[in-house]
A protein has these predicted regions:
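Extended acidic/polar, glycine-enriched regions
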Residues: 141, 203-295, 669, 675-676, ...
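Short flexible loop/turn segments that cap and initiate beta-strands
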Residues: 46-49, 214-219, 232, 262-268, ...
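Beta-strand-rich structural segments
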Residues: 202-206, 272, 631-635, 682-683, ...
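Short, hydrophobic beta-strand segments
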Residues: 136-138, 249-258, 667-674, 767-786
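Non-catalytic, glycine-rich low-complexity segments
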Residues: 23-40, 51-94, 107, 145-214, ...
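Extended substrate-binding grooves/exosites of carbohydrate-active enzymes
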Residues: 37, 55-70, 120, 125, ...
Length: 810
């Protein structure tokens, strides 16, 4: 949720500026941090000398700079995230803050953070993916300098993917008057929604840190998307000394506009606390009016409209940027997915950055908000004797922080927890504990636990939650048979494996086949033994329309989990750990957001109103002249005719009744004798020509091309431009086999934030100024400075014409 009077300052020593009303001041603590990796028992003391420490900005991931450990664990990215780290920052708290309540709010610290103010422990937290806050009023010294120190320790954190390390999400300092709205203190619901009206119920937790009882007026005002006032009310409540009380307000909203995918209308509530007729606090909360129901036989309805979930799972890293949260990087990920036809996100497998939910609210994406992977060290549970306490405080922060987001339609309390699914005693008790706390803090949404052990349904763990969520291979079928009165979602679908731009022959007859290439063919026919290709999930949803939809594993490639080329695979094949990859092959797009072929398969099915005609593979196969090179076409059309050098190779049509899923959703010419030249496909839909697409045999690369996703970015020190690097032939065609070494230079008001080529086998530094093209492409990420002007990025390589692009920093 957004807090009022948002203020960002970027000096090494942060100065706070109060508003004239002296209400609520929210400051992002992003700059002026000192960092040192390792253990240091004195680092929390104010007089400790940190002059030799690294100056960093927060959010910060200390491990993403590497170096890669070739003998390390590919499952967590082969990066040095295990260890200890210290952060220190000087805060100058103005004298005017005397008498105020001061909080520190951390969106996420990996892991087991300890927070110190002026040498004293302010508090601890454990779960690295969850947000937490501390009241530091008694520890700070208004009118002077204060030392904030944060210790992070990832040694006892366990992970199946790259988690990052350090203060990887936003930190805020919040100064409020003694009477104020609590952190995450509003809860907005719409219990009655009709075409002409909606009842908006606003619960507000108001805190009084004075030593005497206070009577205050709580005023609620609703504003529409244009900023016009559309409703208000107020009530008087008494709050005991050093206590809190709840205000319950109801406003009738006339002719409400609904929030839904495709039309995500947001309202906002401004909550004002008045003491003696003076406003002492203001707090703003966006919300949406929407009615969501999920039925066992007909799936999901939003505002009485059937919506098939076309979702993706997203891990929290941003490739070359690591785990450090960046708003633009997140926004770009969602834009790429939404353009494909995606309408939903699952936050696998942890509570997300709050900005992700803000973006989903604004963009109209539905969300399964998931809090844990397992109930063990992956959730930073190192001692289960206090499980009730752990569950209570973590579920409280998770749900209370997120419950006003209209995008969230389902709470998930965990993923693939075998010890819970198969343990009717201890495991089921843990599950019931988690669900109990979710339902206490939000009774308006349904709950689930994501399952993978099909036979465990016989123990009926689904009796405790609301929706069947199962991963892979129609494993939902038994649970559906045993309990048909609950809706079904495929919470992880596909897990198709591929490497962008890479193809192998012949086509595999075994989906799990691996080769010495350490890559996976982009014909989209590979998957792990437990999973399936995309077409299978499309078919199951067509044949079983009660299934509410799917969440593909995954939207983006991510660091870690490099199935199939893991350390275990290397060992089984008598190879060293050095051959294990650093990042996944699961993504619909690569680690940089460059689409794989599979992107267009999903787009053709999920976004059928937009023309898609995509040919694969590329047509540069000099070693295969006269040999077979199968050609696939992904299109939203029904049929297509393929031509090679002007000669028709026949017309193919999809077969919607086929038991072979690929015949329903792809057009395949499996016997094409390769000759260089031009491959053209003409697609048809309902008998009418839809369009055509051409792939040519390219010449040798002669020039580079730089293509920024945006040429104008904000001069805020955070905004990003993702600049695609490509090698072209003399006719301007992208050379699909180019692997030139590229040198990047940058001048002007920007810095190089990251660089990568999407190759899971690349161990080049993400912070280098050199990159090798991977099948003709790579990506450099440029971050703006805080000063307006321009920045010019240039790319050079031996033997090719260089390229440059100028960005406006505004």
């Amino acid at each position: 949720m957004k807090l009022a009077n948002f203020l960002v300052l970027s000096f090494f020593v942060l100065f706070f500026v109060q508003s004239a009303v002296a209400q609520r001041t929210v400051s992002v603590l992003d700059s002026g941090w000192k960092f040192s990796e390792g253990s240091n028992e004195q680092a929390f003391l104010p007089d400790f000398n940190d002059a030799g420490w690294q100056t960093v900005e927060v959010p910060h991931d200390w491990a993403i700079e590497g170096p890669f450990d070739m003998a390390g664990n590919g499952s967590t990215g082969k990066l040095p995230w295990k260890g200890e780290g210290w952060y220190r920052k000087n805060l100058e708290i103005p004298a005017g803050f005397a008498g105020k309540t001061i909080y520190l709010l951390f969106d996420g610290v990996m892991a087991f953070p300890q927070v110190f103010i002026n040498g004293q422990l302010a508090g601890k937290w454990d779960y690295g993916y969850n947000s937490f806050y501390l009241d530091v009023t008694k520890l700070v010294q208004p009118g002077g300098e204060n030392l904030l120190a944060v210790y992070a320790d990832t040694r006892n954190h366990d992970s199946r993917w790259y988690p990052g390390a350090g203060i990887y999400r936003k930190v805020q300092l919040i100064a409020v008057n003694p009477v104020h709205v609590d952190i995450w203190g509003t809860y907005i619901t719409t219990p009655v929604i009709k075409p002409h009206m909606a009842t908006v119920q606003i619960e507000t937790s108001v805190r009084n840190n004075n030593s005497v009882e206070k009577q205050v007026v709580v005023k609620q005002t609703i504003f529409n998307k244009k900023g016009y006032k559309v409703g208000e009310t107020s009530e008087t409540i008494a709050i005991s000394a050093t206590g809190n009380n709840q205000s319950n307000s109801v406003i009738t909203l006339l002719n409400p506009e609904r929030w839904e995918p495709g039309n995500p209308v947001l309202y906002s509530v401004k909550t004002e606390i008045l003491e003696n007729n003076q406003i002492v606090d203001t707090y703003e909360t966006p919300f949406g009016v929407r009615e969501i129901r999920i039925t066992p036989d007909h799936g999901l309805y939003v505002n009485d409209k059937r919506v098939q979930l076309k979702g993706v799972n997203l891990h929290h890293d941003f490739g070359a940027l690591g785990a450090a949260f960046n708003y633009r990087a997140m926004q770009r990920q969602l834009e790429i997915m939404q353009e494909m036809g995606c309408n939903a996100v699952r936050t696998s497998h942890n509570s997300p950055a709050p900005e992700l939910l803000d973006l989903c609210d604004k963009m109209g994406l539905l969300v399964i908000d998931e809090v844990f992977d397992k109930y063990d060290a992956k959730a930073d549970i190192t001692d289960t004797t206090n499980f009730e306490n752990f569950a209570h405080r973590n579920i409280r922060n998770f749900v209370v922080r997120d419950r006003n987001h209209p995008s969230i339609f389902l709470w998930s309390v965990g993923n693939e927890m075998g010890d819970v699914q198969w343990d009717k005693n201890g495991g089921f008790n843990k599950l019931k504990t988690m669900l109990k706390w979710v339902e206490q803090f939000d009774s308006t949404r349904l709950t689930t636990m994501v399952c993978d052990s099909k036979e465990s349904a016989k123990l009926r763990h689904f009796d405790f939650y609301d929706v069947h969520c199962w991963n892979y291979g129609r494993r939902y079928s038994l649970a559906r048979e045993m309990e048909p009165n609950k809706a079904v979602i495929i919470s992880e679908s596909a897990s198709t494996l591929s490497t962008r731009g890479f193809y192998e022959f012949p086509l595999p007859t075994d989906k799990t086949k691996t080769t010495k290439s350490l890559q996976v063919s982009s014909y989209d026919l590979h998957a792990p033994y437990w999973a399936e290709i995309a077409d299978d999930d499309f078919m199951w949803q067509q044949d079983e329309p009660y299934v509410a939809g799917e969440f593909v594993w995954t939207g983006f490639d991510y660091l870690g989990e490099p199935e199939p080329y893991t350390n275990m695979w290397a060992k089984q094949n008598g190879l060293s750990d050095s051959v294990a990859s650093r990042s996944s092959y699961f993504g619909i797009v690569d680690l940089n957001g460059i689409p794989k072929d599979r992107y267009f398969l999903y787009k053709s099915y999920w976004n059928p109103e937009e023309t898609t005609i995509h040919i694969l593979p590329h047509w540069n196969w000099p070693e295969r002249v006269g040999q077979n090179v199968p050609v696939f076409v992904y299109t939203n059309g029904d049929c297509a005719e393929l031509f090679l050098n002007g000669k028709s190779l026949g017309k193919k049509c999809k077969n919607p009744q086929s038991a072979n899923s690929t015949e329903r959703f792809r057009l395949m010419w499996n016997e094409v004798v390769y000759q260089p030249g031009e491959l053209k496909v003409v697609a048809y839909k309902e008998g009418e020509m839809l369009g055509e697409s051409i792939v040519k045999t390219t010449g040798e690369p002669v020039q580079l091309l730089l293509t920024p996703d945006r040429t104008e970015i904000a001069a805020d020190g955070k905004d990003l431009s993702f600049v695609l690097i490509e090698a072209l032939d003399k006719d301007g065609n992208v050379c699909p086999l180019a692997d030139n070494n590229i040198k990047i230079s940058l001048s002007g008001n920007a810095t190089l934030a990251g660089i990568d080529n999407g190759n899971p086998q690349s161990f080049s530094s993400f912070k280098s100024d050199n990159i090798k093209l991977f099948y003709g492409k790579a990506m450099v990420i440029i971050k703006s400075a805080e000063k307006a002007g321009t920045a010019t990025v240039a790319a050079v390589t031996d033997g090719l014409k260089s390229a440059e692009s100028t960005l406006e920093i505004q």
